[in-house]
């Protein structure tokens, strides 16, 4: 390991942040403007001052504090072991030992003391840079030799892909010069000139004389150590102009060059440090820039191949594999493809750091749980799941109908903030691994489930039973509250109430369709008050029930009427003769249902009829609509029963949480079921194909209702107010998410 920790105090968006326990691969994610690039600025500034460069000072996070600090704690365990070994007594080894380890004048700071306390067999070295208001700086270690040596042993390289010259790869030479510890002291300049003179001169002395003439004319400063490294390496290879797959760089696309540049740089970084004690740090800002998603995946895959090639483990050993610690590689990304591949391929050798903003505007950094032991999850972990790590708000649902509902464009137009939420249909395997409650990402979320995932009711025994999820939730709630927490007593009381439900009898009526006195709505409300802490919301009914209720019933009837009037076409290529024939066969007053069924069907196209046919068709439709409404109100006792019949017809459940299929299997509510069956076969035959999940009725009904309300109300606020009255559960979920998103947006822009 290269770095043990980085601490930043009162600089840029950082109030006081400590990053520690780095892995070989460190993937940084987060929304724009949360401080990801500020980490790069801080590290870059620290190293610039380490190398005595003049750079623009960093802004303070708050001017109430007169100073800012950057503290790097380096892991010197390996280098100390090397330089204290009897085998290594070279000049540079002695210099390292005398500079870093022999002196007792270097005091340990708090981070170093903590690090030593936690690992007595390890060696650490901390260096703090203090920035003052007058732009002056102070180092915790005065000796410039120490700082220079740290810059040599732990070099820093950064790549901002948006700003690199994709046709000039010379920065790679700088990298190469930083990754070795060659000794040039024994290289005699005159001997080198004589050697070359002997090898390349056509006549003895020609090369030497040529060099002498050049030196007599020009005046140059001596090569630095790094320049010597580059020149000696270039002499030994066939050329120093980079090509990509044998082609000149200018002939390649920007994306191809960017990918190859990064691959080459990281390949060299890993390869050249396997037998060196220099431990570099590299930071790549948005490596995905200019890359196709599949090429972005290949970038991580190829990095993993070279990483694995040299890695020595108990299972993998042999020539060419080393236990040498890898460089610390950081890359910040907005790419789900890169994040996905990092998590899947690097396992425990990676970590994901999630940057977000606190309410006060300072940067928060959370280490995400990004290692998974569940191979089922890793097998299905795709870009769809990875993109949730970048979400502003996540709504986890349990069905395609919910996806259709919450992604409805008409709704999103009325609630623009909600359009920023990710709606995700998650099974239990994915939900257990990807929800922010597990990953520890600072992403607000809610898990929406039906109440029947918690409880089950038997019409025969008139008793509830608690499902496993309820038992699990009770355990989680108990853990969430401390015994002395002021809210513990209230939650404990609610938990006891929930547990008592299964031992009490709840009478039903109307053949088990409704409860007699028990209110499922009240139970759901009480559950949601305490489950909110677990980011869970349980709907009193299903999505079908939330859409079809007593408040929405008038709109549902109007929607059915709209389907009849606008979507039903004449079921014959000769409409004039056909409609006359059907009129003669069926009496419009006493046989309107068979007449309607014979004449009309749901049509994809809307042919133009003669005015006479239009009038005849409209008369039949209106007669049928009047008959349908009268029949519905005569067949059922009240609107509560009408709503239930429609819910069940469209795949919903009774108040006692029975579907039509379950009622049939248990032999319950036979008369009620028979009524629904008759409606499906006769009066509502044209809707029967839509009475299934994802058939499209949710979208068409919701669009119709919003359009209808829009025509009734004067502004969006009144439209939203009416929607909240008609669909209270649905809109409360949307409003809660919107409020959270708007608050987050405000903190980012404020």
Curated annotation (Swiss-Prot):
GO terms for biological process: defense response to virus. A divalent metal cation 2 binds at residues 402, 623, 641. Residues 391-704 are annotated as: Toprim domain. GO terms for molecular function: ATP binding; ATP hydrolysis activity; metal ion binding; nuclease activity. A divalent metal cation 1 binds at residues 398, 450, 452. Probably binds 2 metal cations. Its EC number is 3.1.-.-. ATP binds at residues 33-37. Residues 174-260 are annotated as: Dimerization domain. Keywords: Antiviral defense, ATP-binding, Hydrolase, Metal-binding, Nuclease, Nucleotide-binding. Homodimer. Belongs to the class 1 OLD nuclease family. This is Retron Eco8 OLD nuclease. It comes from Escherichia coli. The gene is old.
């Amino acid at each position: 390991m290269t770095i043990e920790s980085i601490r930043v105090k009162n600089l840029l968006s950082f109030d006081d942040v400590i990053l520690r326990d780095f892995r070989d691969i460190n993937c940084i994610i987060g929304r724009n403007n949360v401080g990801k690039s500020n980490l790069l600025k801080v590290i870059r500034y620290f190293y610039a001052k380490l190398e005595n460069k003049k750079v623009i000072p960093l802004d303070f996070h708050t001017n109430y504090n007169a100073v800012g600090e950057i503290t790097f704690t380096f892991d010197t365990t390996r280098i100390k072991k090397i330089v204290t070994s009897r085998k290594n007594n070279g000049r540079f080894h002695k210099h390292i030992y005398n500079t870093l380890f022999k002196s007792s004048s270097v005091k340990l700071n708090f981070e170093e003391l903590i690090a030593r306390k936690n690992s007595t067999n390890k060696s650490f070295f901390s260096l703090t840079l203090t920035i003052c208001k007058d732009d002056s700086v102070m180092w915790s270690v005065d000796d410039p030799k120490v700082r220079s040596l740290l810059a040599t042993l732990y070099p820093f390289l950064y790549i901002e892909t948006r700003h690199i010259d994709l046709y000039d790869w010379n920065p790679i030479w700088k990298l190469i010069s930083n990754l070795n510890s060659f000794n040039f002291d024994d290289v005699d300049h005159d001997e080198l000139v004589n050697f070359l003179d002997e090898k390349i001169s056509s006549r003895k002395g020609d090369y030497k004389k040529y060099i002498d003439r050049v030196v007599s004319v020009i005046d140059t400063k001596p090569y630095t150590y790094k320049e010597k490294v580059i020149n000696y390496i270039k002499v030994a290879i066939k050329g120093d102009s980079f090509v990509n797959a044998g082609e000149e760089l200018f002939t390649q696309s920007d994306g191809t060059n960017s990918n190859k540049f990064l691959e080459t740089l990281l390949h060299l970084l890993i390869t050249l440090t396997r037998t060196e004690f220099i431990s570099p740090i590299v930071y790549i800002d948005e490596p995905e820039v200019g890359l196709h998603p599949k090429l972005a995946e290949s970038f991580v895959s190829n990095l993993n191949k070279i990483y694995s090639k040299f890695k020595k483990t108990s299972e993998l050993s042999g020539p060419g594999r080393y236990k040498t610690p890898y460089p610390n590689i950081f890359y910040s990304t907005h790419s789900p493809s890169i994040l996905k591949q990092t998590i899947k391929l690097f396992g425990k050798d990676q970590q994901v750091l999630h940057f977000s903003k606190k309410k006060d505007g300072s940067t928060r950094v959370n280490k995400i749980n990004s290692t998974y032991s569940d191979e089922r999850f890793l097998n299905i972990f795709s870009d769809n799941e990875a993109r949730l790590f970048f979400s502003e708000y996540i709504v986890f649902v349990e069905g395609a109908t919910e996806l259709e509902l919450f992604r409805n464009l008409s709704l999103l137009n009325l609630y623009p903030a909600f359009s920023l939420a990710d709606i995700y249909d998650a099974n239990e395997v994915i939900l257990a691994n990807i929800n922010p409650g597990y990953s520890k990402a600072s992403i607000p979320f809610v898990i929406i489930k039906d109440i029947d995932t918690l409880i089950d009711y038997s019409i025969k025994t008139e008793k509830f039973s608690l499902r496993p999820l309820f038992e699990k939730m009770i355990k989680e709630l108990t853990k969430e509250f401390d015994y002395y927490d002021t809210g513990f007593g209230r939650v404990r009381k609610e938990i006891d109430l929930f547990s008592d439900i299964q031992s009490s009898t709840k009478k039903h009526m109307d053949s088990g369709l409704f409860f007699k006195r028990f209110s499922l709505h009240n139970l759901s409300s009480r559950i949601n008050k305490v489950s909110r802490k677990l980011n869970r919301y349980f709907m009193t009914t299903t999505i079908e029930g939330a859409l079809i209720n007593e408040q929405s019933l008038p709109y549902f009837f109007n929607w059915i009427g709209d389907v009849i009037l606008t979507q039903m076409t004449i079921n014959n290529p000769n409409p004039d003769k056909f409609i006359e024939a059907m009129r003669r066969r069926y009496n419009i007053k006493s046989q309107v249902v068979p007449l309607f069924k014979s004449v009309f069907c749901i049509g994809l196209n809307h042919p133009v009829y003669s005015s006479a046919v239009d009038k005849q068709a409209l008369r039949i439709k209106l007669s049928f609509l009047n008959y349908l409404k009268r029949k519905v109100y005569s067949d059922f006792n009240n609107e509560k029963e009408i709503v239930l019949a429609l819910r069940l017809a469209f795949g919903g459940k009774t108040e006692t949480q029975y579907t039509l299929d379950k009622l049939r299997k248990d032999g319950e509510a036979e008369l009620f079921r028979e009524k629904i069956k008759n409606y499906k076969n006769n009066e509502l035959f044209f809707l029967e194909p839509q009475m299934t999940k994802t058939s499209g009725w949710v979208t068409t009904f919701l669009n119709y209702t919003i359009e209808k309300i829009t025509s009734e109300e004067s502004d969006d606020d009144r439209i939203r107010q009416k929607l909240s009255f008609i669909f209270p559960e649905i809109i409360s979920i949307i409003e809660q998410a919107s409020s959270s998103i708007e608050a987050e947006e405000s903190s980012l822009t404020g």
